[in-house]
Amino acid sequence: ADFDGDGRTEVAFVETPHIGGSLRLYEFRDRKLREDYAVRGFSNHAIGSREQSQAAVHDWTGDGVPDIAVPDARRSAIRFVTFADGKFREFDGVAHNQKIVTALRPAMLDGSGTVYAVYGLADGTIVAVRPNPGR
């Protein structure tokens, strides 16, 4: 996806999610894969867990550039981030007393067209968050 709005496709991933993970964006430029951004403090799965889908992509800010929802390094908060206009910005987040343990998915739940980030916590709670892009 074009995560920064520059017209080029980037690949987003969390490197070393178990030890102070970094959210990184790379793009193919000048016939090489080049790092565009690296921001520490993220995770997308727990050691030993088979769940490998703890991140979601959707344009929550409505600016035409995909945003990313991903847990913090401890997996006890969800962070909503954007790289629009070439700048990293965290525009919302929700902290929890339990770890995030399920996949994280964008979902329309009520027919209004609003897209929520949906995921589950270690105590069995299902969470649906509608991020506030203006925060």
Kindly give the residue locations of the regions a language model identified.
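Beta-propeller-forming repeat regions
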Residues: 1-135
